[in-house]
Amino acid sequence: PLAIPSYVAAYTWLAAFPGLQGFVPAWAVLSLVSLPYVVLPVAAVLSQVDPAFDEVARTLGDGPLRSFRRTTAPLLWPAAAAGGLLTALYTLSDFGAVSLLRFDTFTRVIYTSYRAAFDRTSAAVLSLVLVALALVFVLLERAMRGRHQQWRVGAGAARRAERIPLGPWRWPALLGVVALFGLAVAFPSVMLVRLMLQSQRFEADPQAWLTATANTVQAAGVGALVALLLALPIGVLAARHKDRVTKTVESAAFISHALPGVVVGLSLVYLGLSL
């Protein structure tokens, strides 16, 4: 789903159901495209959880649910909280989906204020409010995550968790995964192909496609490299030092994820006019 922009996903749903608008459609589309933000970190933690924790809890008399709540859930909580933070910040910064679905959010109001007003002060004030909201989400995530620490007693290496047969729940679980994939990836892809085939004005221009592809790859590659160079020192610092300054720097790095392109563009335009 991360490969499908939110406005493209919203456009495909609007093409299939023209009456969609408001909070519920916007919430559904943004939830579908944001699934990997939570699934990837939680899945990474689950793949590394030592089954010895659950085995010890079961030995001490805990049932499956109680054992999960006391051993596995605390290990998943930091990853789930971080994924939820990324999802919240992504939702704050989204502009395309909420605009197509006609649901007023800060990003849409900022853009409308910038286009309609001669004075850009109102847009700047709204942008500051958006940054403040992002800061609130970051602080809330830090408070919910708490001071997570983990110890392991013994010299043995951690074991990978074994696969558990789901039995009669196998097909419902598979159906749920397939349904999520269908709604988040398959449906938008099929609708895009259908719209392309139905279009009477569609003209294949290989040169334009190659140019657009090259520009996209170039922008993505340079952006990824710059982001890596900027984020790597922060990641190393956060992993090796747990003081207050490091946590502040780590939290500040998340705030940029909440800044929509329209806000960054306004800032660059204002900077260019001021120089």
Language-model-detected regions and their locations in the chain:
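Membrane-water interface segments at the C-terminal ends of transmembrane alpha-helices
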Residues: P1-S47, A73-G96, A123-R142, P168-L197, ...
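Conserved MFS/SLC helix-loop-helix module at the cytosolic interface between two early adjacent transmembrane helices
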Residues: V49-T59, S67
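Membrane-helix interface/capping residues of multi-pass secondary transporters
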Residues: F53, D62-P64, F95, R120, ...
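Glycine/proline-centered hinge or cleavage motifs at structural transition points of membrane proteins
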Residues: L60-D62, P74
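Peri-membrane helix termini and adjoining interfacial loops of integral membrane proteins
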Residues: L101-T107, H148-A157, V193, L197, ...
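Flexible interhelical linker loops that connect adjacent transmembrane helices
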Residues: M144-V177
